[in-house]
């Protein structure tokens, strides 16, 4: 598959570029970004801002950056795009829908469409079946092939998978406290020196996302939309900490009836999903 990264010069875009460099299924054919980067080689556009631990892949250095707003041009060169633009939410929604309407599927790292009822928010091991809602989304957008799918808030990925296998044991409440690295804000210590030896006890919007997004992931499709689950009740507190990469979560879970320790361990050990069944390239053999 020929793929593109829209928003390729930012920190998340760089991560996509790094992950795609040696991917066995996907060939990085297009890097796109803002007009100020367009026309430059990727190496020129990113320069000293390359923030990944591995060197910039050789095959991308001399690729010419396209203008992300030139949707038809980008879409004509790829089978689908990964989107990691840094823009206002309204602008992101419009841009992603433009790509979808150009019959170019969009896999988005952004939060702009996470609350859109017919846009699936996927953790593949948990709710791969939610891709069925794409049929309704295509009807709304008037597309045959184009669609938008999104990933959830990055901090949720650390603990929602651990809670999911326990839902059948009667989880009623979740109390989560996340300690989130500065990479989640698209920053490094070089670009955010104020975070050295510092903590920010509140991250605007993160608590709301952390309380709502898991319920959409655990929801079901009804009348062409994803209806969020009503349980469990989730309360979250999100703190920015002086760590470069990697989020930490401390989570307390309440059950209707306390399960045995052995039942919890068994649920974790036996849980897997479609990525494990299909042996996908980046899927861990054991999910938890």
Predicted regions and their residues:
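C-terminal substrate-binding/catalytic lobe of Rossmann-fold NAD(P)-dependent dehydrogenases
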Residues: 202-288
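N-terminal Rossmann-like NAD(P) cofactor-binding subdomain of oxidoreductases
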Residues: 1-202, 231-233, 262, 266, ...
